[in-house]
Amino acid sequence: MSWTRVVVLSSLTTLLILTFSSVVKSAAVRDDSKAGDPKGAARHVFMPESDASNFFKHRSRRSPRYYSERQAEQRVRLSANERRREYNEEQRNEFENYVEEERDEQNERSREKNEQVREYHYDGLYPRYHWFH
């Protein structure tokens, strides 16, 4: 029970110190009247009413899109498809080259190994049918 009193008292004193300190005054929002022009700030944030109504009129769900907008979206889609196709083709070519090189190396290793085995087991009789005795 005593430790809760200590915690509560320390938090209350900290809160009291922070409310009356000068550091908090500088961090608080100022109430002076010489703040920036509110109309200028609103002008940067909001657009005129006519532009906003035109924007929503053109962008509503039911309004048809313009032909040029459709064409532009189609061009963007086609160019993205072309880039994806080229990238996939490049990746496929690189993989095919890698597989071909690996296959060639594997064939070379197995051929060398077969030649070594053949040389090791050769007993001087060359026609092949003499090998099996």
UniProtKB/Swiss-Prot annotation:
Origin: domain of life: Eukaryota
A GO BP entry: embryonic skeletal system development
Keyword match Signal: yes
Subcellular location: Secreted, Extracellular space, Extracellular matrix
GO cellular-component term (any): extracellular matrix
Role: May be involved in the negative control of osteogenic differentiation of osteochondrogenic precursor cells in peripheral zones of fetal cartilage and at the cartilage-bone interface.
Protein name, per record: Unique cartilage matrix-associated protein
The organism of origin for this protein: Dicentrarchus labrax
Recorded name of the encoding gene: ucma
